[in-house]
């Protein structure tokens, strides 16, 4: 066990050193800060439990170095430390709570600029030198390059000796403009700013629009007592400071501090520069000295960092996927990138029209996001590295049938298409539908390829004992598959109706049908025999549109679909589902909800199911058409978006009565 732990520590140290070089020296990081920080935390945890394996070269005792060989190394007059950081607001609040302000609350909050750290040295009011942070003890002398930044005064009105800390950055607009002309584009504005600053020829640097904010005094010659006085002094001396820095005193509360952080978080995409969090600092310098320092960071400051909402990557290939409805969806295979807490290697391109609108082809560098914090999508082309635009093929990749365009999408219209068939079976077995345990995509694909099944009906006629002769299918697994199939026969009618795959008929629409007394196969079948009457009846239900109405009518007049229903009825499936309809249910019927956060004593899935049973419609993301957002503790980015769109907010107390 000890050897295994020692090896993990060594592996972590090696990996972190590699990432340090990529970030600080090459300006080409391969992982997001969130991933890096999690590895640092893991290393700290192991070293804390096993101090016998902690060595002096551990990254937990140091921070990364940006020292380069082609610049002179100069010693800093004071240690240039890093910042401690958290990704959780509760941990940030805990840090504030632990500080003894002695009844004199004083905190400053400012955006954490995602740029390149710099230290400026003034002698008698004249800029003497500018050093990168380096390894905290030594930095590279980039004075000539820094002198080209017009926001840095070369001479001050006062003859003072100063050591100042700032952040060199480049605006979002200039990042996109410059990146288009670079042979090897940068993945972030921070990396571009860092790369420009490290150019050997200062004449080249002068051609780029670098910017800077100064945010700290590192020497005490001016005898300033608080951070607000220090920032005011910086302004007076002619330095550019972030206008969004705000100071909170004894008249303020932690709630006001957290509200301001929420405000910055909400508005960050509108800022002209990239930020990756906010920085909180104790304002009183006497208290700062009392709180002290570690070898890594001051104890009087804390960075609250955001998880990345988007990232940049290169498109390596584009594959065309065929869905259960025959819809063709192009998907980009991209270099691995970390966005919103997950690694992404594939991102949807929606359809051919979308590809044309962004001018995308294989080889281009793109911006990737996770829409609704779930579905990865390509947002735009950052750098056009290839000629032309990708074209979806004319024929289905699975059955070679000529594709037909309906609206913005291409479809394979072949009902016997193998890709369509296998996707329908996967959908039927999926968790949201019949939830047939053990039938993974891999298992279903195996059964389909061996021609044991060709439709969902075959799941109930196939002799699963035939699988015993195949590798990976032992007695217990086969027995579990059979039991899962039997258990699925007891599922409610709403699940069967969803699983059968009527085009665009989802859980919410089914719930609306049931609330309007269309809660059985026989009722729906009888209604749809008179197409005109069925159409007008369905359109009277709020939330049922023309497309869904026509698809329902078509399905209940289609012989293949009706034969499926008849098959399941003969097997003993439930073909009717009772639902309690009262005045309370009607208040929620058809209303569109979304949910975020955690709820004491209730999982989100339970809340969703209970409200769905009363007619509520649940959406996965916040949009303009949403009626309500239910907000629990630790609410995410959905709350920010809902406030921007003026969506009504409901607390747990507001919905509690509906959960009984």
UniProtKB/Swiss-Prot annotation:
It comes from Borrelia garinii subsp. bavariensis (strain ATCC BAA-2496 / DSM 23469 / PBi) (Borreliella bavariensis). Keywords: DNA damage, DNA repair, DNA replication, Ligase, Magnesium, Manganese, Metal-binding, NAD, Zinc. It is an enzyme of class 6 (ligase). Residues 583-660 form the BRCT domain. The keyword rRNA-binding does not apply. It catalyses: NAD(+) + (deoxyribonucleotide)n-3'-hydroxyl + 5'-phospho-(deoxyribonucleotide)m = (deoxyribonucleotide)n+m + AMP + beta-nicotinamide D-nucleotide. This is DNA ligase. Its cofactor is Mg(2+); Mn(2+). Pfam families: BRCT, DNA_ligase_aden, DNA_ligase_OB. NAD(+) binds at residues 33-37, 82-83, 110, 133, 167, 281, 305. One of its GO terms (molecular function) is metal ion binding. The active site is at residue 112. GO terms for biological process: DNA repair; DNA replication. Zn(2+) binds at residues 396, 399, 412, 417. The lineage of its organism: Bacteria, Pseudomonadati, Spirochaetota, Spirochaetia, Spirochaetales. Its EC number is 6.5.1.2. DNA ligase that catalyzes the formation of phosphodiester linkages between 5'-phosphoryl and 3'-hydroxyl groups in double-stranded DNA using NAD as a coenzyme and as the energy source for the reaction. It is essential for DNA replication and repair of damaged DNA. InterPro entries: BRCT_dom, BRCT_dom_sf, DNA_ligase, DNAligase_adenylation, DNAligase_N, Hlx-hairpin-Hlx_DNA-bd_motif, NA-bd_OB-fold, NAD_DNA_ligase_OB.
């Amino acid at each position: 066990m000890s050897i295994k732990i020692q090896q993990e520590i060594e592996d972590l140290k090696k990996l972190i050193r590699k990432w340090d070089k990529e970030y600080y020296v090459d300006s080409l990081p391969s992982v997001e800060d969130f991933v890096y920080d999690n590895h640092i935390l893991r290393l700290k945890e192991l070293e804390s439990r096993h101090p016998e394996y902690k060595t002096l070269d551990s990254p937990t005792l140091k921070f990364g170095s940006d020292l380069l060989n082609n610049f002179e190394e100069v010693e800093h007059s004071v240690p240039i430390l890093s910042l401690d950081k958290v990704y959780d607001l509760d941990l940030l609040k805990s840090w504030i709570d632990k500080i003894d302000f002695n009844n004199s609350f004083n905190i400053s909050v400012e955006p954490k600029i995602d740029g390149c750290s710099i230290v400026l040295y003034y002698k008698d009011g004249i800029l003497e030198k500018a050093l990168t942070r380096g390894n905290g003890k030594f930095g590279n002398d980039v004075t000539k390059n820094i002198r080209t930044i017009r926001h840095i005064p070369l001479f001050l009105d006062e003859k003072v000796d100063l050591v100042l800390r700032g952040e060199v950055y480049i605006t979002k607009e200039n990042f996109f403009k410059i990146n288009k002309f670079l042979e090897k584009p940068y993945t972030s504005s921070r990396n571009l700013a860092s790369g420009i600053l490290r150019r050997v020829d200062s004449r080249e640097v002068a051609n780029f629009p670098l910017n800077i904010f100064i945010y700290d005094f590192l020497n005490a010659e001016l005898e300033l007592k608080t951070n607000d006085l220090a920032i005011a002094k910086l302004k007076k001396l002619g330095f550019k400071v972030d206008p969004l820095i705000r100071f909170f005193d004894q008249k303020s509360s932690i709630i006001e501090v957290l509200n301001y952080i929420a405000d910055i978080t909400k508005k960050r995409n509108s800022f002209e520069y990239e930020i990756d969090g906010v920085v909180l600092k104790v304002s009183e310098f006497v208290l700062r000295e009392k709180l002290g320092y570690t070898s890594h960071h001051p104890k009087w400051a804390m960075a609250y960092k955001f998880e990345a909402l988007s990232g940049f990557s290169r498109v390596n290939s584009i594959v065309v996927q065929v869905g259960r409805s025959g819809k063709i969806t192009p998907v980009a295979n991209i270099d691995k990138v970390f966005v919103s807490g997950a690694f992404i290697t594939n991102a949807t391109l929606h359809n051919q029209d979308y590809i044309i609108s962004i001018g995308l082809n294989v080889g281009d560098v793109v911006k990737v996001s996770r829409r609704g914090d779930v579905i990865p999508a390509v947002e735009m082309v950052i750098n056009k590295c290839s000629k032309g635009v990708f074209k979806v093929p004319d024929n289905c990749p699975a059955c070679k049938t000529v594709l037909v365009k309906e609206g913005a999408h291409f479809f394979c219209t072949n009902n016997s298409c193998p890709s369509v068939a296998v996707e329908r079976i996967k959908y039927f077995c999926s968790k949201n539908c019949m939830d047939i345990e053990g039938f993974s995509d891999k298992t279903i694909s195996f059964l389909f390829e061996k021609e044991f099944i060709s439709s969902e009906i075959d799941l109930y006629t196939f002799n699963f004992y035939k699988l015993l002769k195949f590798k990976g299918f032992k007695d217990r697994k086969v027995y579990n598959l059979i039991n899962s199939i039997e258990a699925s026969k007891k599922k409610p009618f709403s699940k069967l109706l969803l699983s059968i795959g009527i085009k665009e008929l989802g859980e919410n629409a089914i719930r609306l049908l049931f609330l309007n007394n269309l809660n059985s196969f026989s009722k729906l079948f009888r209604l749809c025999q008179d197409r005109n009457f069925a159409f007008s009846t369905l359109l009277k239900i709020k939330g049922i549109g023309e497309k869904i109405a026509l698809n329902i009518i078509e399905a209940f007049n289609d012989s293949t679909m009706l034969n499926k229903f008849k098959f399941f009825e003969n097997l003993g499936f439930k073909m009717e589902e009772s639902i309690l309809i009262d005045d309370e249910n009607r208040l929620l019927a058809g209303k569109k909800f979304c949910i975020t956060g955690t709820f004491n004593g209730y999982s989100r899935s339970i809340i969703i199911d209970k409200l769905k049973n009363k007619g509520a419609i649940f959406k996965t993301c916040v949009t303009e058409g949403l009626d309500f957002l239910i907000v629990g503790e630790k609410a995410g980015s959905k709350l920010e978006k809902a406030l921007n769109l003026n969506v009504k907010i409901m607390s747990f107390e507001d919905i509690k009565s509906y959960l009984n």
